[in-house]
Design a protein with these regions (language model features):
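Enzyme catalytic cores with a strong preference for nitrogen-chemistry domains
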Residues: 1-174
Length: 174
């Protein structure tokens, strides 16, 4: 997490001491925050090795000229490297001297952009994905086997069930 310039993330966040996956139906996903995915390796790699088929990156990445293209290429690379879908969800709007430009993305495990949010306006990007391609790709990826061997034991992995696309709950009004 960034802790420089205008960012003071250690005021709000602390590094985790384990991995957490979320289970939604047949899909396992992991969550990263902002700069967690700016470089190859953990935590994204560890989440993928633990079984995440989708990595959600929540971010408040400020606008700089051409930054949206740089981020897109970076997330396309992370998706390919980890054989995971990536959903990059960026903030939109202003805070103090910062402007956040959105440009959220959904990318498949081969690095293809499947959906793109607009720049400088709020939007809800909804897309159906089939992460079963991740499983097939991982079975034939020799780099993944070598990486798993290099990383060794990932330690305990918590899995939290967050529902199913087929579950319905009654609404409650107060």
């Amino acid at each position: 997490l960034p802790n420089y310039g205008v960012f003071d993330e250690f005021r709000y966040f602390a590094p985790g001491d384990g991995l957490t996956l979320f289970e939604f139906g047949d899909t396992l996903f992991g969550v990263t925050i902002c700069e967690d995915m700016w470089q190859p390796g953990p935590p994204a790699t560890d989440l993928a090795l633990a079984g995440a088929q989708l990595i959600v990156n929540i971010s408040a990445s400020p606008f700089h000229l051409l930054r949206d293209r740089e981020r897109e290429e970076m997330f396309r690379t992370r998706a390919r490297d980890n054989a995971t879908f990536v959903a990059f969800c960026n903030t939109v709007g202003g805070q103090d001297e910062l402007i956040f430009d959105g440009h959220s993305l959904v990318i498949d495990d081969e690095g293809t952009v499947l959906a793109r949010g607009p720049g400088f306006e709020e939007a809800l990007v909804v897309i159906d994905v089939d992460p079963s391609s991740v499983v097939a790709r991982r079975l034939t990826d020799t780099r993944r086997r070598a990486l798993a061997q290099d990383r060794g034991d990932l330690g305990p992995v918590a899995t939290i069930h967050v529902g199913s696309p087929h579950e319905h709950t009654d609404s409650v009004t107060a």
